[in-house]
């Protein structure tokens, strides 16, 4: 989710910490 932010925008928030 960290390296695929663009690929997975749904987990982007979760990976970022909220």
UniProtKB/Swiss-Prot annotation:
Expressed by the venom gland. Its main location: secreted. GO terms for cellular component: extracellular region. Keywords: Neurotoxin, Secreted, Toxin. The keyword Iron does not apply. It is found in: Secreted. GO terms for molecular function: toxin activity. The keyword Secreted applies. Belongs to the scolopendra toxin 5 family. This is Scolopendra 5924.74 Da toxin.
